[in-house]
Each structure stands twice: as C-alpha cells, then as structure tokens.
C-alpha cells in the first residue's frame, strides 16, 4: 500500500499498490523462467525431439538432427549453460550473498544480461533488416527460419537479457 497525503492537514489515504510493481523480485523470477524454458527446449531437441526444430534453421538445426555423440555433447553443454543462467538469476532472490560473493553474483548476472541483450538485439536488428530487404546477405536466406529468429528465438534472448538486467538493477538498488 502506498500512502498519499492530501491537503494542508495532511490527511493520509492508503492507495493499493499493484502487485506487479510492488514485488521487486519478479524480474529475477521471470529471467529464471525464461532461462529454464529455453533450456527445456534445447534439452528436447538434444534428446531427439524435432517439434519446431525447423524454425531454428542453419547450423543449430543440422547439429540437432545429426544424433551423434558430438551433437549430444554440444546440446547438453548448451542446456547446462542455460540452467546455470537460470540458477544465477534465482540467486538474485537470496539474501545471503554479501561482499565479494555478492559482487561476483551481480557481475555474473550483469555479464549474462549484456551478452543476451547484445546477441538477441543484434540478431533481431540484422534479421529484421534482411527481412525488410534493406540488407542483402551474400548467401541464400531461409526466410522461414529467419522470421522465427527475428520474432521469437532471438527476441526471446533480447527480452530475457533485458529482464535480467532489470533484476540486477533492482538487486543493486535494494542493497544501497
């Protein structure tokens, strides 16, 4: 509840605060959810699933379709990386981290958010320019896969990174 003071006498009125704004922990939870969801999709493809695999296109699709030990190891490594990112985001919810541990946690999450925003943002921008016909790549373009990347897969990374950056900023603000 927020308090609003009206008039010279200081009459106080309590206004409800929207839960979405009041809960400063939602960005960390949302970032973790996006990380775990991304890891789940990658795990599905790593274990041989093919649903929506054609929307990825290019080398990632080829690697996932190979079903070799190397492709499994690569997929498993990506899953571990995404799960680790989700756990790091959840660690922002904890109260125990202080001093060097807290700085390391904030640095790791901050670095991850920058990487996600840069990767997702650049991919959305460049892919969008190609789809709009403003940039012509040297090779052939899988327009179907590119549309999925611009409007879903790469946008997912961009949103995940932006929400993670918000979680880091809120953790920094809460500690000061």
Each predicted region: which residue ranges?
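Transmembrane helix-loop junctions in multipass membrane proteins, especially transporters and channels
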Residues: 47-54, 94-97, 128-135, 169-176
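C-terminal TM-helix exit segments that contain a strictly Trp-centered aromatic cap at the helix terminus
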Residues: 37-49, 114-131
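Hydrophobic transmembrane helix segments
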Residues: 38-73
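Individual transmembrane alpha-helices with interfacial aromatic-anchor signatures
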Residues: 73, 108, 141-160
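Interfacial non-cytosolic loop connecting adjacent transmembrane helices
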Residues: 59-61, 123-149
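Alpha-helical transmembrane segments
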Residues: 28-39
């Amino acid at each position: 509840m927020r308090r609003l003071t009206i008039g010279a006498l200081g009459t106080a009125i309590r206004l409800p605060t929207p839960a979405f704004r009041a809960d400063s922990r939602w960005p960390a939870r949302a970032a973790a959810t996006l990380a775990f969801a991304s890891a789940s999709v990658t795990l599905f493809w790593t274990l041989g699933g093919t649903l929506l695999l054609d929307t990825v296109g290019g080398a990632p699709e080829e690697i996932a379709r190979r079903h070799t030990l190397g492709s499994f190891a690569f997929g498993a490594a990506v899953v571990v990386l995404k799960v680790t990112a989700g756990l790091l985001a959840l660690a922002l919810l904890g109260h125990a981290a202080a001093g060097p541990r807290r700085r390391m946690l904030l640095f790791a999450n901050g670095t991850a958010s920058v990487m996600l925003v840069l990767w997702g943002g650049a991919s959305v921008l460049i892919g969008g320019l190609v789809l709009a016909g403003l940039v012509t790549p040297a090779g052939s373009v899988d327009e179907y896969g590119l549309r999925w990347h611009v409007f879903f897969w790469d946008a997912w990374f961009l949103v995940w990174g932006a929400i993670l950056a918000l979680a880091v900023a809120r953790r920094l603000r809460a500690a000061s």
